[in-house]
């Protein structure tokens, strides 16, 4: 995943003695977040992309080794978390969400609420990003927790 979501993963894993979990599809981003080329369509998205790319160039990411590789449908009960993994590719190749208690969905950057709730402004694969946004919308009445911004009720994100 991107630095703004995993920059402290190594520190937290060591300090709390917990495993790092992520999708294997994003493993190439651990040493360098620029490994997956990002695109944006809107002016606001292009501004966010420019700021993100500058951050990737100057910020450092302590290299870490994931202990758990997440896949669609994985249940995390054995790790003490009542959650199910939902693959939401598009923002990155390995974007995942967590469905918790049946009515909460943590979506990372598959959707964004930086300025207003919307589909992801940045993506590695626009078609997959739109498919993931559609999948989220079809998951019914849930509270959506974004990687950025306040939670909102689920709705159709793609027409």
Regions found by a protein language model. Name each.
Residues 1-68:
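Active-site HxH/HxHxD metal-binding segment of metal-dependent hydrolases
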Residues 10-14, 34-38, 102-103, 120-122, ...:
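Short, glycine/charged-enriched secondary-structure capping and boundary segments
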Residues 29-33, 79, 115:
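Residues that scaffold the ATP/ADP-binding catalytic core of kinase and kinase-like folds
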Residues 59-61, 75, 82-157:
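Metallo-beta-lactamase
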Residues 68-77:
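Short internal loop-to-helix segment that lines adenine-nucleotide cofactor pockets
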């Amino acid at each position: 995943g991107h630095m703004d979501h995993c920059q402290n993963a190594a520190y937290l894993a060591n300090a709390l003695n917990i495993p790092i979990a992520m999708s294997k599809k994003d493993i190439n981003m651990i040493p360098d977040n620029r490994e997956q080329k990002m695109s944006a369509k809107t002016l606001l998205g292009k501004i966010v992309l420019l700021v993100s790319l500058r951050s990737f160039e100057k910020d450092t990411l302590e290299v870490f080794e994931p202990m758990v590789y997440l896949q669609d449908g994985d249940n995390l009960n054995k790790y003490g978390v009542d959650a199910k993994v939902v693959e939401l590719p598009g923002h990155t190749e390995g974007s995942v969400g967590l469905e918790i208690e049946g009515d909460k969905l943590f979506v990372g950057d598959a959707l964004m609420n930086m300025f207003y709730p919307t589909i992801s402004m940045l993506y590695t694969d626009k078609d997959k990003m739109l498919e993931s946004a559609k999948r989220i919308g079809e998951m019914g009445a849930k509270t959506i927790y974004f990687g950025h911004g306040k939670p909102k009720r689920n709705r159709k994100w793609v027409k």
